[in-house]
Protein backbone atom coordinates (compact mmCIF):
# COMPACT_ATOMS: atom_id res chain seq x y z
CA UNK A 1 0.00 0.00 0.00
CA UNK A 2 1.41 3.37 -0.96
CA UNK A 3 1.09 6.42 1.23
CA UNK A 4 0.18 9.81 -0.17
CA UNK A 5 0.83 13.36 0.93
CA UNK A 6 -0.35 16.72 -0.36
CA UNK A 7 2.42 19.33 -0.62
CA UNK A 8 1.48 22.97 -1.12
CA UNK A 9 3.59 25.79 -2.63
CA UNK A 10 4.54 29.09 -1.13
CA UNK A 11 4.44 32.49 -2.75
CA UNK A 12 5.78 32.85 -6.27
CA UNK A 13 3.73 30.24 -8.13
CA UNK A 14 1.01 32.68 -9.21
CA UNK A 15 0.15 33.35 -12.86
CA UNK A 16 -2.57 35.13 -14.82
CA UNK A 17 -5.37 32.70 -15.57
CA UNK A 18 -4.79 30.55 -12.50
CA UNK A 19 -7.86 28.46 -11.56
CA UNK A 20 -9.88 29.84 -14.49
CA UNK A 21 -10.20 26.39 -16.07
CA UNK A 22 -11.36 24.97 -12.73
CA UNK A 23 -13.91 27.78 -12.35
CA UNK A 24 -15.30 27.02 -15.81
CA UNK A 25 -15.43 23.21 -15.41
CA UNK A 26 -16.18 22.54 -11.75
CA UNK A 27 -19.21 23.60 -9.74
CA UNK A 28 -17.24 23.00 -6.53
CA UNK A 29 -14.37 25.22 -7.70
CA UNK A 30 -16.80 27.93 -8.80
CA UNK A 31 -18.47 27.89 -5.36
CA UNK A 32 -15.12 28.10 -3.55
CA UNK A 33 -13.98 31.00 -5.72
CA UNK A 34 -17.23 32.88 -5.17
CA UNK A 35 -16.97 32.22 -1.42
CA UNK A 36 -13.44 33.65 -1.43
CA UNK A 37 -14.53 36.76 -3.35
CA UNK A 38 -17.36 37.30 -0.85
CA UNK A 39 -15.20 36.64 2.22
CA UNK A 40 -12.53 39.07 1.07
CA UNK A 41 -14.84 41.75 -0.27
CA UNK A 42 -12.71 41.94 -3.39
CA UNK A 43 -13.03 40.38 -6.83
CA UNK A 44 -9.97 38.16 -6.37
CA UNK A 45 -11.16 35.86 -9.15
CA UNK A 46 -11.02 38.72 -11.67
CA UNK A 47 -7.43 39.49 -10.65
CA UNK A 48 -6.51 35.79 -10.86
CA UNK A 49 -8.14 35.26 -14.24
CA UNK A 50 -7.33 38.57 -15.95
CA UNK A 51 -4.67 40.45 -14.04
CA UNK A 52 -3.12 42.86 -14.42
CA UNK A 53 0.03 40.94 -13.53
CA UNK A 54 1.37 43.80 -11.40
CA UNK A 55 -1.72 43.59 -9.20
CA UNK A 56 -1.55 39.79 -8.93
CA UNK A 57 2.12 40.12 -7.89
CA UNK A 58 1.13 42.28 -4.91
CA UNK A 59 1.46 40.09 -1.84
CA UNK A 60 -2.00 41.00 -0.54
CA UNK A 61 -3.48 39.37 -3.68
CA UNK A 62 -0.79 36.79 -4.45
CA UNK A 63 -1.15 34.94 -1.19
CA UNK A 64 -4.93 34.45 -1.20
CA UNK A 65 -4.80 33.58 -4.92
CA UNK A 66 -2.22 30.82 -4.45
CA UNK A 67 -3.97 29.59 -1.31
CA UNK A 68 -7.33 29.47 -3.10
CA UNK A 69 -5.93 27.64 -6.12
CA UNK A 70 -4.15 25.11 -3.91
CA UNK A 71 -7.18 24.41 -1.74
CA UNK A 72 -9.42 23.98 -4.77
CA UNK A 73 -7.03 21.45 -6.30
CA UNK A 74 -6.76 19.56 -3.02
CA UNK A 75 -10.53 19.51 -2.68
CA UNK A 76 -10.98 18.17 -6.20
CA UNK A 77 -8.57 15.27 -5.59
CA UNK A 78 -9.47 14.60 -1.95
CA UNK A 79 -10.52 11.04 -2.86
CA UNK A 80 -6.79 10.25 -2.92
CA UNK A 81 -7.01 10.46 0.89
CA UNK A 82 -3.54 11.69 1.82
CA UNK A 83 -1.96 10.56 5.07
CA UNK A 84 -0.28 13.93 5.45
CA UNK A 85 -0.43 17.51 4.22
CA UNK A 86 2.46 19.96 4.30
CA UNK A 87 3.29 23.30 2.78
CA UNK A 88 6.12 25.73 2.30
CA UNK A 89 5.48 29.05 4.05
CA UNK A 90 2.11 30.21 2.67
CA UNK A 91 1.43 26.59 1.70
CA UNK A 92 1.11 25.71 5.38
CA UNK A 93 -2.32 27.36 5.38
CA UNK A 94 -3.47 25.19 2.46
CA UNK A 95 -2.16 22.15 4.32
CA UNK A 96 -4.17 23.12 7.41
CA UNK A 97 -7.37 23.36 5.36
CA UNK A 98 -6.57 20.09 3.58
CA UNK A 99 -6.13 18.40 6.97
CA UNK A 100 -9.42 19.90 8.24
CA UNK A 101 -7.57 21.78 10.97
CA UNK A 102 -9.09 25.13 9.92
CA UNK A 103 -12.13 26.06 7.86
CA UNK A 104 -11.67 27.43 4.34
CA UNK A 105 -13.70 30.60 5.01
CA UNK A 106 -11.59 31.50 8.06
CA UNK A 107 -8.33 30.59 6.36
CA UNK A 108 -8.90 32.74 3.25
CA UNK A 109 -9.44 35.80 5.46
CA UNK A 110 -6.40 34.93 7.55
CA UNK A 111 -4.25 34.51 4.44
CA UNK A 112 -5.40 37.90 3.10
CA UNK A 113 -4.49 39.54 6.42
CA UNK A 114 -1.11 37.79 6.29
CA UNK A 115 -0.52 39.02 2.74
CA UNK A 116 -1.44 42.59 3.66
CA UNK A 117 0.85 42.52 6.71
CA UNK A 118 3.73 41.15 4.68
CA UNK A 119 3.18 43.70 1.92
CA UNK A 120 3.20 46.53 4.47
CA UNK A 121 6.33 45.12 6.11
CA UNK A 122 8.05 45.26 2.72
CA UNK A 123 7.05 48.91 2.33
CA UNK A 124 8.16 49.80 5.86
CA UNK A 125 11.42 47.84 5.62
CA UNK A 126 12.50 47.74 1.98
CA UNK A 127 14.89 45.01 1.00
CA UNK A 128 15.23 41.97 -1.17
CA UNK A 129 15.94 38.27 -0.93
CA UNK A 130 18.39 36.13 -2.86
CA UNK A 131 18.93 32.37 -2.81
CA UNK A 132 22.56 31.29 -2.50
CA UNK A 133 23.09 27.84 -3.97
CA UNK A 134 26.11 25.61 -3.49
CA UNK A 135 28.04 27.38 -0.72
CA UNK A 136 28.61 26.01 2.75
CA UNK A 137 26.48 27.71 5.41
CA UNK A 138 29.51 28.97 7.34
CA UNK A 139 30.89 30.64 4.19
CA UNK A 140 27.56 32.40 3.55
CA UNK A 141 27.47 33.58 7.18
CA UNK A 142 31.01 34.98 6.84
CA UNK A 143 30.18 36.79 3.58
CA UNK A 144 27.06 38.28 5.17
CA UNK A 145 29.10 39.58 8.11
CA UNK A 146 31.64 41.17 5.75
CA UNK A 147 28.91 42.70 3.59
CA UNK A 148 27.11 44.12 6.61
CA UNK A 149 29.79 46.80 6.81
CA UNK A 150 27.91 48.65 4.03
CA UNK A 151 24.33 47.60 4.82
CA UNK A 152 22.23 44.93 6.44
CA UNK A 153 22.93 41.52 4.93
CA UNK A 154 22.00 38.42 6.85
CA UNK A 155 20.93 34.82 6.45
CA UNK A 156 17.15 34.72 6.38
CA UNK A 157 16.48 31.03 5.87
CA UNK A 158 18.41 27.80 5.54
CA UNK A 159 16.19 26.07 2.98
CA UNK A 160 18.40 23.02 2.57
CA UNK A 161 22.06 22.09 3.00
CA UNK A 162 22.76 23.55 -0.45
CA UNK A 163 20.44 26.58 -0.47
CA UNK A 164 20.48 29.57 1.86
CA UNK A 165 18.33 32.67 1.46
CA UNK A 166 19.92 36.01 2.37
Feature map (PLM): residue ranges:
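Generic anion/oxyanion-binding catalytic loop in active/binding sites
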Residues: 18, 59, 96, 129, ...
